[in-house]
Amino acid sequence: MNRHLCVWLFRHPSLNGYLQCHIQLHSHQFRQIHLDTRLQVFRQNRNCILHLLSKNWSRRYCHQDTKMLWKHKALQKYMENLSKEYQTLEQCLQHIPVNEENRRSLNRRHAELAPLAAIYQEIQETEQAIEELESMCKSLNKQDEKQLQELALEERQTIDQKINMLYNELFQSLVPKEKYDKNDVILEVTAGRTTGGDICQQFTREIFDMYQNYSCYKHWQFELLNYTPADYGGLHHAAARISGDGVYKHLKYEGGIHRVQRIPEVGLSSRMQRIHTGTMSVIVLPQPDEVDVKLDPKDLRIDTFRAKGAGGQHVNKTDSAVRLVHIPTGLVVECQQERSQIKNKEIAFRVLRARLYQQIIEKDKRQQQSARKLQVGTRAQSERIRTYNFTQDRVSDHRIAYEVRDIKEFLCGGKGLDQLIQRLLQSADEEAIAELLDEHLKSAK
């Protein structure tokens, strides 16, 4: 269980009985952190620093914390109510005559609750099996029944694994699904504008390569849309379309400012041989279908011009580059990656649709007026989300206080990056459960 959920359960005024001793603390693993305004809805006029942050939860502690969450009265009451509602719906659909419109509504709700009710019942049955096993162990004679005790211990371990799996399955079912999670994305990277910009440009290339390698690691398709190189092997700007299974779900928290601290090895900054700090930005745009964003030709201005950069005499003779201007919003998209004007126009339209789609998503979220802001961040493009400290060989994600060593391995875009992304997803899921319980408690008052 994530520390944010521990904090919520520990501090909530309605949840009496959740004692501090239930949280197993090891002082050398924990450090203080001030919880920012993203958690304001849960602390409600409390200003405090909570000492509940672990950089590395062991699997044993995760299982214990998951069990504590399940045992808590708030979640137990919530699941009891859902189970009762499911049973009532089942009886109503079987025995009480209702009109067709109401029946469709009841069937939809019944289908929503069926998986949760099934998991809840299985958890109760498994807990009953644990109680019976513990009762049997207490009645055994230590000397005469040693073999039975060993068998009982093995059985208990098997049941523990099963019930932990059921807990996780239940929590996954409780988390609301985002409708954009299955979308493909357009990923853009841009070097920061700071003194000694070559360090930013080199870092931008490394981050772009990292996401390209991660796409291979996840067996996604990576299509290059734009690539503007810089001096000393750096990168000014690049964009790519990434398509595959659950791309936006995994990359949606990568958008933001990535910071680097290092002694440059090449470029003008390398002459001073001191630590430099630079930044680059990542933008992750969910890719819409044609039906999601319709472009009216009257709202567009299409300009063509000669491409810049390497390419021989061709770039000086043909107007292959394309610029699209969406007049109502003022969005401007350029593409000069391909030698063909038709291909550049196709890519530019694709990027423009993605940016307009992002505006639709943000507007949709504002209209929902959800009180929840993910602990993993607001995903604002101006938010600094991660620091890559080369001198200390450490990557730090500031949203969940996660740290990992071996930067070179992390930048390979394999297991290290995937583990961090999974932790971000877990943190967001657990915050969603905390909000769910918070709303349930408020409605019960």
Swiss-Prot record:
Its main location: mitochondrion. This is Peptide chain release factor 1, mitochondrial. Signal peptide: none annotated. The keyword Zinc-finger does not apply. The GGQ domain interacts with the peptidyltransferase center (PTC) of the large ribosomal subunit to trigger nascent chain hydrolysis. Keywords: Methylation, Mitochondrion, Protein biosynthesis, Transit peptide. The modification N5-methylglutamine is found at residue 313. Mitochondrial peptide chain release factor that directs the termination of translation in response to the peptide chain non-canonical stop codons AGG and AGA. Non-canonical termination codons AGG and AGA are found at the end of MT-CO1/COX1 and MT-ND6/ND6 open reading frames, respectively. The gene is MTRF1. SUPFAM superfamilies: Release factor. Residues 297-361 are annotated as: GGQ domain. The keyword Protein biosynthesis applies. It is found in: Mitochondrion. A motif (GGQ) lies at residues 311-313. Belongs to the prokaryotic/mitochondrial release factor family. GO terms for biological process: mitochondrial translational termination. GO terms for cellular component: mitochondrion. One of its GO terms (molecular function) is translation release factor activity, codon specific. Methylation of glutamine in the GGQ triplet by HEMK1 is conserved from bacteria to mammals. It holds the Pfam family PCRF. Residues 1-61 form a transit peptide.
